[in-house]
């Protein structure tokens, strides 16, 4: 998983609450187990017409938001089903940080597991950041995870809270497997010791 330290990126304003996971990635695209290739389908129903053409009024179809790395929205982002494909689609599009007043719990957790930083900020702060984002390329935001601040285009800083362990894992680029592999030596030692001390627990299958 890619480390998250400091991100300076175009932010896309999406002033809508209760965006569920089916809006983020519709169910018909969940057949794949690959994390790549889903970005083109992110917000599919909001981005495209039935004939597949783009809806020009949707923010991610507009320059410069096609290159957005930050998404700002309203309450309860990621509600609905618990599909992990939702953060996969956002990440494959290029989104590394989502900012909202609140998130659905499972989506919130899945973001961390996939290298996306979800930040909770009050509604009025999200409104102010959306105003910044509407400046387009001149409204880039910086998210400094090490210092736990969002830096606005005018240099003003907004502090945010994050669980210390989750902060550490993002800074180090560690997902669940990477976190486990940090203890690989201790696991190998335990397994070797267990086999010697309790050999009856090791099954030997003879054809």
From Swiss-Prot:
It comes from the Bacteria. Pfam families: Aconitase_C. Keywords: Amino-acid biosynthesis, Branched-chain amino acid biosynthesis, Leucine biosynthesis, Lyase. It is an enzyme of class 4 (lyase). Its EC number is 4.2.1.33. GO terms for cellular component: 3-isopropylmalate dehydratase complex. SUPFAM superfamilies: LeuD/IlvD-like. One of its GO terms (molecular function) is 3-isopropylmalate dehydratase activity. It catalyses: (2R,3S)-3-isopropylmalate = (2S)-2-isopropylmalate. InterPro entries: 3-IsopropMal_deHydase_ssu, Aconitase/3IPM_dehydase_swvl, AconitaseA/IPMdHydase_ssu_swvl, IPMI_Swivel, LeuD. Pathway: Amino-acid biosynthesis; L-leucine biosynthesis; L-leucine from 3-methyl-2-oxobutanoate: step 2/4. GO terms for biological process: L-leucine biosynthetic process. Catalyzes the isomerization between 2-isopropylmalate and 3-isopropylmalate, via the formation of 2-isopropylmaleate. Belongs to the LeuD family. LeuD type 1 subfamily. Heterodimer of LeuC and LeuD. This is 3-isopropylmalate dehydratase small subunit. It comes from Gluconacetobacter diazotrophicus (strain ATCC 49037 / DSM 5601 / CCUG 37298 / CIP 103539 / LMG 7603 / PAl5).
